[in-house]
Design a protein with these regions (language model features):
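Consensus positions within tandem repeat domains that build extended binding/scaffold surfaces
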Residues: 1-5, 22-25, 44-49, 67-72, ...
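N-terminal exported-region signature
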Residues: 202-343
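Intrinsically disordered, low-complexity segments enriched in small/polar residues
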Residues: 1, 22, 88, 96, ...
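Structural signature of tandem-repeat unit edges
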Residues: 7-20, 29-42, 52-65, 75-88, ...
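Extracellular/lumenal glycan-associated surfaces
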Residues: 49, 117, 162-163, 327-335
């Protein structure tokens, strides 16, 4: 055990006669690169624990289990190719390491507790199709945005995907989308706050877990959805259907008086049935003042409706439009000038 503990070595050649690497063999050493030969059939726990200079490791192709704490706190280890026969990743295996990208092998069945905990640079990962178990806190404190749980998963531990950072004393969840394929209900205290949760059509969510998600899609459909853009764009990781969508945008650029100015571009992934204007409130009740593009018949039938400018970008140039259709680019200008009376 601990054969090269704390040694100042950059590389090391393991002879072909070696069949076992004992517990903690290289931990706290300064090793940078190492190839483990195919003759090695047993690797014990904490082999490279706290090897802060380690950047490259080649593992034997016949390896089926990654030992516990093998690369714990290897801060310079950014990626590693795992053997295709690997079925289990041990507890704390990559905890607090520098891993930022990894392809999990298709045969992987078990990810033990705390396996990737604290890998703050890890933003995405694809779970393989035969995975059965994800241990508690396995991906906690990572930067994962979107995750899909395979239907084969039968066990998932608490806080497994509490993907947040706690810098400066505040907690920010990185998780945006969760796709849940198992037939059993989405459990409580597994995921950090997320915007979208996709479950099977007949799927269920633990009652105290529902509040963790802004929108829940059953069979890809949700009853109502609100989109508010503080910036210039929004994104959704997976195709969705909503029975009703409310889209809010604040137009504060000053226009001309009775003439357009301060144009904005807009592209929406859905047709727009109704436009309304509210000066302060953004409640989803569609009770604001009705709006319509110049040329829309609503301006002729509703005396309370207010006009705005709308042009579609076509292959031959901008053309005046009376409605917004899905996935088409438009220029839009809302009358916004102090010379207008307040609405």
């Amino acid at each position: 055990e601990n054969a090269f503990y704390g040694c100042k070595i950059a590389t090391f050649n393991i002879p072909a006669s070696v069949t076992t690497i004992k517990e903690g063999a290289f931990q706290y050493s300064s090793i940078q690169e190492i190839t483990i030969p195919e003759t090695v059939t047993t690797i014990e726990d904490r082999c490279f624990n706290n090897c802060n200079e380690l950047t490259k490791v080649t593992l034997p192709t016949n390896m089926t289990e990654l030992p516990n704490s093998m690369f714990w706190s290897c801060s310079k280890l950014k990626t590693i190719q795992l053997p295709s026969k690997l079925e289990k990743i041990g507890s704390h295996a990559f905890r607090d390491s520098g891993i930022n990208a990894m392809q999990l092998p298709q045969n992987l069945k078990v990810i033990e507790y705390w396996a990737f905990n604290g890998c703050t640079q890890l933003k995405s990962i694809t779970l393989p199709p035969h995975l059965e178990k994800i241990g508690e806190r396995a991906f906690e404190s990572t930067s994962i945005n979107n995750i899909e749980i395979p239907a084969t998963v039968t066990e998932i531990g608490e806080r497994a995907f509490r993907c947040y950072n706690s810098s400066e004393g505040s907690y920010k969840s990185y998780l945006n989308t969760v796709v849940w394929n198992p037939s059993w209900e989405v459990p409580y205290n597994v995921f950090s706050a997320a915007t979208y949760l996709y479950i099977p059509e007949n799927g269920s969510v633990a009652s105290n877990a529902e509040y963790n998600f802004t929108y829940i899609f059953r069979g890809g459909v949700t009853d109502q959805m609100e989109i508010k853009t503080d910036g210039n764009q929004f994104s959704i990781a997976k195709e969705l259907k909503a029975k009703k969508v409310y889209y809010y945008k604040n137009f504060n650029t000053e226009s001309g008086y009775n003439s357009p100015a301060g144009w904005k571009t807009i592209v929406l992934p859905f047709d727009v049935d109704q436009f309304t204007y509210t000066r302060y409130s953004t409640e989803p009740d569609a009770t604001g003042t009705p709006l319509a593009p110049f040329g829309n018949t609503l301006l002729e039938t509703d005396d309370t409706a207010l006009p705005f400018w709308l042009y579609e970008l076509t292959p031959t140039g901008y053309v005046s439009a009376t409605s917004i259709q899905a996935n088409k680019p438009y220029l839009i200008c809302m009358p916004n000038n102090r010379a207008y009376p307040e609405a």
